Regions:
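Cysteine-centered catalytic environments shared across enzyme families
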Residues: 1-251
């Protein structure tokens, strides 16, 4: 079990005040420290920040996250990932990627995902067998994707605050972001008390905090010139409309 968190905003530059945003990332990780007592790390670029707390299982020395790699092929694409979970067919995928020109620095499954996405792109996701949630950032296209396993074993939540997109393994990571309102959703609370495990999938206690549904992908990218967010993938249409509308109104 590990913990991931982060934020993305295409309208600003987090690197203009790195101390502030490094501290925010560290806080988003620290509130989930029970998920990863063996290590922590952060990654900050102009439009994205990633945080990770780690429970070491595979490659304790080399598997630190966030993990950043540059692909030998595809024009040398560079990407970063924060990952929580286990890929059962990681050894087989590693052999396939080695034949395709990938170079591995560790033995952990995190790097298999990262190299696979850099080499094959999003179609690589269909090759993954396991339990997982992760966030992947690709530098050249300035694209962030959130992915959750088919059974929804590993949790992943997201929200927006103004023009900033937030995500975390646990809701407390989102609530730790400065000025994010911790407002109880009456309907969500009633479902928890009344229906328990039978509640509407993705419905939670806090307003404007959503759950990435099992087997779903959320893609966040900037449209050139218009500077808007584009949401795609298997995301609930009403949620996509709500997020997209909020961000457009604030552009």
């Amino acid at each position: 079990m590990c913990g991931i968190a982060g934020f993305c905003n295409f309208h600003g530059n987090f690197r203009e005040d790195p101390g502030k945003y490094y501290q925010i990332l560290q806080t988003m990780g620290r509130v989930q420290k029970h998920r990863g007592p063996d290590g922590d790390g952060v990654y900050l670029q102009r439009h994205v920040g990633l945080s990770h707390v780690r429970l070491s299982i595979l490659d304790p020395e080399g598997g630190a996250q966030p993990m950043v790699r540059q692909c030998a092929g595809q024009g040398g694409l560079r990407g970063a990932i924060v990952f929580n979970g286990e890929i059962y067919n990681s050894p087989a995928l590693r052999e396939e990627l080695l034949r395709e020109g990938a170079f591995f620095e560790t033995t952990c499954d995190t790097e298999v995902i990262l190299q696979g996405l850099l080499l094959r792109g999003l179609p690589f996701l269909s090759s993954l067998h396991g339990i997982f949630s992760f966030a992947f950032w690709e530098d050249a296209t300035e694209q962030l994707i959130l992915v959750r396993d088919r059974l929804g074993v590993k949790p992943l939540f997201y929200a927006t605050l103004g023009q900033t997109f937030l995500f975390s393994s646990e809701i407390k990571g989102i609530l730790s972001f400065p000025d994010f309102p911790a407002e109880v959703d009456r309907e969500g609370l009633c479902e928890i008390f009344g229906l328990g495990p039978a509640k509407t999938y993705g419905k939670g206690v806090f307003k404007n905090v959503h759950e990435v549904l099992p087997g779903h992908v959320i893609t966040l990218r900037r449209i050139m010139k218009d500077d808007e967010y584009r949401l795609s993938g298997k995301v609930n249409d009403s949620i996509a409309f709500e997020i997209g509308g909020t961000l457009r109104r604030r552009t």
